[in-house]
Structure formats: C-alpha cells, structure tokens
Amino acid sequence: MSSRPFVTIYDGITGEAEKTQVRLPAVFLAPIRGDVVHFVYRNQSKNTRQPEGVSTEAGKQHSAISWGTGRAVARIPRISGSGSGRNGQGAFGNMTRKGHMFSPLKNFRKWQRKTPKQMRRFAVASCIAASAVPALVSARGHHIAGVPQIPLVVNSKSISVIKKTKQAVYLLKKINAYSDVLKVIASKTIRAGQGKMRGRKIKERKGPLVVYGNDDLQAVKAFRNIPGVDTCRVENLSVLNLAPGCHMGRFIIWTESAFKKLNTIFGTQKKMAQGKSGFRIAHAQMVVPDMKRVVVAAEKAKLLRAKIVLPKVPKRANPLKNWAAMVKLNPYAKIASHKLAQVAKAQAVHKAQYAAKMEKILAAKKEALNQSVAKRFGKTQKVDGKVVKVKVENNLLKATVKRTAKQDAYMKKYDGIVKANAKKYAEKIGF
C-alpha cells in the first residue's frame, strides 16, 4: 500500500509536473493479498481455454470384426479381408497398431471456473494497491529508474490529442517510461515448440499498462501498436491485465480522468462503491507494514517473556594432551620446551660431528690397511691383462680396525657427562 497522501499530475507533452495535485484514492490503501490474487488469477485464466479432446472416431476407422472363440487366438477385433499382411491384424484396442488410446480425452470436461464476485473485486483492489509500491513494480521487472513518481498520472489533455503511434512514443519518452518499452523490444524471442504454428510465434515481456477513461478512447489505437504496451478502461480492470502471470506490481500509467474515477468505482473504507454494488474496500489488518519496526517495538517487548540466557559451560581440555591448555596453566612449560629443544638440537649437532670424525678415522685406517696388504701380497695384480689394485674385504677390515683402550675410556667418560647434565637440567626445570 502507498503512504503518499497526494499525487502529482504530469503533462505528457512537456514532461513537467503541474501545480495541481490529486488526493490518492482509497483503493491504493487496500491490503495486498497475494494468495487471493493467485486464486482469482488461476480461475479466470482457465475461462479463456478452448475445449479440446480426441475424436470419437479416432482408432476405429477400420473394417474389423472379432473372430470369436475356437481359433486359439485373442478375441480382439481383426482387420477383414485377405491377401495382405494387414488382414487379420488386431484393431480398435489400445494395445493394437493404429488402435485408439486408452480412456480418450473428452471435450465435455469442466473447462470454466466460477469465482465469487467479491473475491474478484478484492483481488483487483489488491493489484491496484501493489502497483503503487515501487519495490514491487521494480521486482516484477519493470524499468522505472527514471519515472518521476509511482503511481504515475498524466493529464487527460495530453492523452486526448494523441492519434498516431509516434505521438504515443513521444509521450512515453517525455515521462521517462520508454525504457520499459525498450526492455520489451530487447526481450523478443521465437517460441520453441508447436506454438509457433498456432499464432504464438513471438514471446515478449510485458510493458506498461495505460488505463484511460471515457474521454481518452482515440488514444487506444495509438498505444496498441507499441510492443508490450496494453490499454484498458478503468471500469474493465481485471487481475489478468493488472497481474500478468499472477505477479503483482505492474507499471501502470493512469490518465487523470481514470485516476479520479477510482473512488467512485471502488469506494472507500467508509463509503460503499457506486460502480460495484455491495463492495467496500477492506481495512488492512497490518497497520504498520515495516516488520523490523514491529519486531523491535518496546510495546511488544513488554508483553513477551524475557529471553532465557543459559550459562555457558566452560570448556575443559586435558593439559597433558592439549598443548594450549598446558601453556595456559603453566606458562613456563613453553620456555622449558624451547630450552629442551635447544639442548636436543645441540646434542644432534655434536653427534653428527662425532660421526663425521669417526668416519674420517675409519677411512684413514682402511687406506693404511690397503697399503700394508699391497706391500705384503704385491701392490697390483693382473686380471685379464689389466693391472687392478687389490681390495681389502670388509670382514678383514672389521677384524683389524678396533677401538683402543684409550678411546673406550674417553667414550665412557663422555656418555657419563651427558647423562649427568640431562639429569641436572631436568631437576632444574621441575620435570
């Protein structure tokens, strides 16, 4: 629903606003009910269907008769005659070739749907109210960025002088509504399927709807040749042209005479309608459409139960498995771990240096042993006419190279010092 009390009238020739304003009709304050509009639209759209069905003679245009019993064949009617492969074949049944379908569609189905009169009127009022909400109009796909106001009202003088389509296009450009027509032109596509052969070749979007009064009849022929633009008398408004595809919020261009007739046709919340007997615009059940304002209102909060705030259960972690919990309980554990890592790194470096040193000693001893063996058994030997150096086997090397007593005493002393330092450091950090 619109909250605008007055509506400005625009001149279609100059595109400027006039000084006179019109009070917003009460029908724009009607409640917007999408469920009612959906029900009415579905029922009314079914009333335009053309009855269709299967011919009563389909699948039965053969000369066929059943052979009866006694021939060990089915009793289905069979094609009469002889001398052809077609003769004797089953006919008529839905399981036979060229037979009729099962349960053929009849044309005496329930094609029309009745809708309560008051519900139809209520749905039209809801669609008119939705057309005054810019958010709904824009959400439906209309291009209204340059439109001066919603609802858009054009004075009747500029409409009544229009006789040619180029004059109607000029008016739409002046009120910044032609961008919606360009959208329709760009959306033209060829329909897929059999509809191309049945008068529905082109698919296109819907453009603005021009609603006129009795004084603006000659402009209808000018507007009807513009793609996507529809025209309708204010007395003949229906859900089919106000909400195409059952989507409310169509962009409507009102003439001044048609806009002033709305209170007479639909009435107000207090006064009965003259154009629709027994109809009165319903009051909106929701006075404030802003749901955010309703939710955070202080008046509502007083009536509601206070929110229950449950105490948060502390998350307990095992410090022996969770390193972050251990550091939180004992900050020194991080420092101790860092120091232990440094000690382990230093020990690894010392061990690597010692291994490299021992490797050099073993290599030197192996070379000395090779030289002594060469002197004893000859420096070289001839194999297949080539001179080859004598190699010492590993077993002989292992038996020959051994630690001296002095080296064993040094290694025992070194291991004892390492163990003593580790024990002393562990006592110092408290492990």
UniProtKB/Swiss-Prot annotation:
Gene Ontology molecular functions: RNA binding; structural constituent of ribosome
Pfam families membership: Ribos_L4_asso_C, Ribosomal_L4
PROSITE patterns per record: RIBOSOMAL_L1E (PS00939)
InterPro entries on file: Ribos_uL4_C_dom, Ribosomal_uL4, Ribosomal_uL4_dom_sf, Ribosomal_uL4_euk/arc_CS, Ribosomal_uL4_euk/arch
Ranges for region Disordered: 77-96
Main localization of the protein described in the UniProt heading: cytoplasm
Keyword Ribonucleoprotein among record annotations: yes
GO biological process, one term: translation
Subcellular location, record wording: Cytoplasm
Biased composition (Gly residues): 82-91
GO cellular component: cytosolic large ribosomal subunit
Swiss-Prot/TrEMBL keywords: Cytoplasm, Ribonucleoprotein, Ribosomal protein
Membership in a protein family: Belongs to the universal ribosomal protein uL4 family.
Functional description taken from the UniProt entry: Component of the large ribosomal subunit. The ribosome is a large ribonucleoprotein complex responsible for the synthesis of proteins in the cell.
Subunit and interaction comment: Component of the large ribosomal subunit.
Protein name: Large ribosomal subunit protein uL4
